[in-house]
């Protein structure tokens, strides 16, 4: 028991959130069959989009993640399902005066012929914060997967840029138990972060990957989905379409990212544009 005057160790985790979601097909439609929610992670009622995809929002009602916080998200998209997962707001990574890491683990399993897409809101690391994320997606035969994440250099409107202590992210995608994509990012701001050829004058960054299962019909078109300045895209050795971009402002990045996302989804998945309600 902690009493007044008893110091609380800054090194221990302050919160551990867990979210488990299982989707399946019921009466010919994708449905959320099971959910386990441990605060501060939770979901709101699913929405069905006009295209038939089931959309779910992940919510963290707190003011952000703190050093020592840990969250785990596990999603099972059963055979033939169509699932879209979004987050309600930006992930605000609070300062960590004691040097503790805020960590997040995500594991997606996409069943035979299913499609799972994850497009979270922006990650916003505050000055002095430390954030580490690991995301893994395992795809069954003919499964499709899409991911697009964005990162800000800090609280730009307050004049705070590249002041965080450390940011690390690893994304891996496996199809038929073979790794088709691996992306490791490690940002530790330093005196040369703003140098030409590194970040230049840009404050917003994006990275994405899309995998189309067994079908390669749309890959040539999807390999170069955008000609927007500050963006690059290509095809991994395993057949995954990847993209990465930078922009000076958030709206500019988001506009280009939406265009790219819909172009890749059309070319690779043959999917209709997403009509999102927030």
Curated annotation (Swiss-Prot):
InterPro entries: UreD. Pfam families: UreD. GO terms for molecular function: nickel cation binding. GO terms for cellular component: cytoplasm. The keyword Ribosomal protein does not apply. It is found in: Cytoplasm. The keyword Chaperone applies. Its main location: cytoplasm. It comes from the Bacteria. Keywords: Chaperone, Cytoplasm, Nickel insertion. UreD, UreF and UreG form a complex that acts as a GTP-hydrolysis-dependent molecular chaperone, activating the urease apoprotein by helping to assemble the nickel containing metallocenter of UreC. The UreE protein probably delivers the nickel. Required for maturation of urease via the functional incorporation of the urease nickel metallocenter. Belongs to the UreD family. This is Urease accessory protein UreD. It comes from Deinococcus radiodurans (strain ATCC 13939 / DSM 20539 / JCM 16871 / CCUG 27074 / LMG 4051 / NBRC 15346 / NCIMB 9279 / VKM B-1422 / R1).
């Amino acid at each position: 028991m902690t009493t007044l005057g008893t110091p609380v160790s800054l090194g221990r985790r302050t919160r551990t959130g867990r979210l488990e979601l299982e989707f399946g097909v019921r009466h010919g439609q994708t449905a959320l069959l099971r959910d386990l929610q441990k605060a501060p992670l939770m979901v709101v009622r699913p929405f069905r989009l006009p295209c038939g995809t089931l959309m779910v929002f992940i919510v963290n009602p707190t003011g952000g993640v703190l050093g020592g916080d840990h969250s785990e998200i596990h999603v099972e998209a059963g055979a033939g399902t169509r699932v879209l997962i979004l987050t309600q707001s930006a992930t605000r990574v609070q300062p960590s005066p004691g040097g503790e890491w805020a960590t997040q683990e995500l594991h997606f399993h996409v069943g035979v012929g299913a499609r799972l897409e994850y497009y979270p809101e922006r990650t916003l690391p505050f000055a002095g914060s430390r954030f580490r994320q690991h995301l893994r997606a395992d795809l069954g035969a003919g499964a499709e997967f899409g991911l697009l994440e964005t990162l800000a250099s800090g609280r730009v409107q307050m004049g705070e840029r590249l002041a965080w202590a450390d940011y690390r992210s690893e994304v891996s995608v496996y199809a038929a138990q073979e790794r088709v994509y691996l992306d490791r990012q490690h940002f530790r701001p330093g005196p040369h972060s703003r140098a030409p050829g590194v970040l230049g004058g840009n404050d917003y960054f994006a990275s994405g990957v899309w995998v189309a299962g067994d079908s390669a019909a749309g890959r040539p078109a999807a390999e170069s989905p955008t000609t927007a300045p500050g963006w690059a895209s290509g095809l991994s050795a395993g057949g995954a379409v990847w993209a990465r971009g930078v922009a000076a402002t958030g709206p500019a990045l988001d506009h280009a990212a939406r265009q790219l996302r819909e172009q890749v989804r059309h070319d690779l998945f043959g999917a209709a544009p997403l009509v999102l309600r927030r």
